[in-house]
Amino acid sequence: MDRLRSHKAIFLLLLPVLVGCSIGDVRRPPPDRSSASPRPAPTVPTPSRAVGFDEVRHVRVAVDRRYDRPFVEFVDADHGYALFAACDGVPPGRGCTALLYATVDGGRSWQALRHPRPVAEDQQLYAVPGALVLLAEPYGWYTSTDGGASFVHTTGGEPAALVAARGRFQVAEGVGAVAEWDGAALRPLPAQPAVPGLNTVGHSGDLVVAAGARDGRPSAAVSRDAGRHWVSTPLPWRGDDVGVLRAVIAPDAGAWLVGERPDRTGFPALWRLVGGREWALVRAVGHPAQARSVAPLGAELVAVTSPDGVGVVAGGRYYRVDWPLTGEHHLTVLGDGTILARGPDDVVVGTGWTANRRWVRVVLAGG
């Protein structure tokens, strides 16, 4: 009876995005992969019909047309940054300096910021809660905690703001151990989980999940007391190889494991933590052979983009959904639960809860 109620609840969550679907939908063919290594054959593509955005925010700023498309990153649904960092494919120079912009209204408007090192061999932008971090090689890092009004310059390893953004518990690089960030350094915990090939940590409150894969076999351990004690938690496994295992905490604090395939393109294995100590293998009957991105949304739902389009795993099945996204969009979930979908030509922001979203296409251009 409980399972029946759960399936009914999941169906009600999905109903608003399923009502527009039809069995005869025609989908765009997958991109040409002839130059890549052999991969599993995808399901026969038949694309989804065009679905409109709820809003399009297309803004032009005073940037010379020689500049390439900017890199745009959002911290939450409202706050984002954009970096124009090349002209005609060439890194910024004296005649093409890096340009920095910020938005505080979800991309409706953009304000120019002073870039602290506009000429460099390579430019990168990282936007995390509470900080904007720029990397201008070979000069180092520039960190702002006031929305880009001022920057602090550092060299060497990643600045504290970037490390802190990964969470209180992390895997210490080069050590292969679960470590705790104390505000200044990552310090390995006295008690360590027995996880072969440890490579990922996720946490919510005092719950800490550590996982990894070795020789294709996934394994995990769980701590309920902030890493002081660990319990090995066997994973139901069907023998299909896992290349990289990722721990993901959904917006509702649910813990998931995503088992990426060795070729990084095959549809991944999925597990959900049940009762705090047991992993349930999540089935996805009808899923495509490949996946570009996977993002747990909460309420036992997982969003997927693939060469076949966009879908959601729910109640043991894979459902195609009427979202205005393509298989080229890569999904991430921001700290406020917003879905960020990055495509080759745009960034799409999806606000709302679970599968019911308001989709806004954000386009920033010069000229």
Language-model-detected regions and their locations in the chain:
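Repeated scaffold domains used in trafficking and secretory/extracellular systems
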Residues: 66-73, 118-128, 156-167, 193-204, ...
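Solenoidal tandem-repeat scaffolds enriched in leucines and small polar residues
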Residues: 167-240
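Blade-level signature of beta-propeller repeat domains, shared across WD40, Kelch, NHL, RCC1
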Residues: 333-367
